[in-house]
Amino acid sequence: MRRLFAVALSVLIAACSSAPPTLKPLPTLDSVPTVSPTTVAAPATATPLPTVAPLPTATPSPDSVLCPLSGLPVSKSVLATRRPLMVQIGNSGPERPQFGLAQADLIFETLSEGGITRFSAMYLCQDAQDIADVRSARLINLQLIPIFDAILAHVGASAAVLDLIERDIRIRDSRLDYFRNNPGFTLQPERRRPPFDVFTNTQALWDAARSRNVPMPGNPVPEIKTSSNVPLNGINVRAVTIHHHSSYWVRWKWDDEASVWTRHISSDVNAAGDVPHLDAATTRVLTAKNAIIIRAQHKQTDIIEDTLGSRSQNVEITGASGDAIFLRDGQMFKGKWKRDKLNEWFTFTLADGKPYELRPGNTYVHFYDLESLFSPIDVVAR
């Protein structure tokens, strides 16, 4: 049943006029765990891995420029007609496998209520013919949207989060909300049972934004620094596991042949095992060129997100800094993250203080609680 909740991480408060949670200085950060070849035992029963198709090599054209979100070639004339999209995508059991994650340039994964995460998927340089299922906005959107001047596509939000959205004119005037009867969304109950049946696609959202006279292309998009050169002093790893919750974790496994990280999630059948996280359209395992783990303070708020009374969390990533783990090219790098202003991208540095650059391609960013009560980040070395 669709209705507004009064907002889950990834973020009905007593009064809709409440101000957003005040950012507080982060406490001293825990150190990044030391790599141990035996930190995580291999699953007792390995799940066969779906075939990973090699990604096509992009061929630059005279009109080609580098996508600011991925560092891959894209048409300059195409970028001139677009503004970044940030689509809220669910990640509970009935919502998997999702549509459209494989086409996102950049994905943020944030812990939500019920011990599960929610995705904030960024689209700019790739087209997605199906994106589902679209879900409600969270506090984290208010911190991420200003970085890219993005168009938020969502299905409502709690009263408190909607109030905060209305206070930000730039977000308010460009967002696309299914519950406001904005165009760009379709119900497809034959493909997914309600309330997980709200679909969209990138072209429909850009067309809907134009119909509402949303400025295109918007403010300049920050360029995320990428390089084909692998940084020095990385640690060769076979797998890295991120415990977002006691009942849900993500494991990135390195596929040397395809030169990508393959995404796996906790199994509902085998507590120690994992299953491939698949793309609904292709039935192939989701992959990434980069994964970034940002350790940040998570503060519980008084915003109620669901009928069970689950409370939203505020992830303190503005005016803050902390430890980070970077994954690329089959290696793990320890480093730091920093972000001073709401409209700024993160500054990433390696342990030696040198700037960290991502590998060209798609990226997943995990926000990991600094004071997690669950297992630490586990690493299996090669």
Where are these regions (language model features)?
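Positively charged n-region of N-terminal signal peptides that target proteins for export
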Residues: 1-4
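A surface/extracellular/periplasmic glyco- and lipid-processing/surface-interacting theme
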Residues: 61-106, 113-382
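Ser/Thr-rich, Proline-interspersed low-complexity disordered segments
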Residues: 16-67, 72
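Flanking scaffold residues of small Cys/His-coordinated metal-binding clusters
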Residues: 8
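Hydrophobic core
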Residues: 11-14
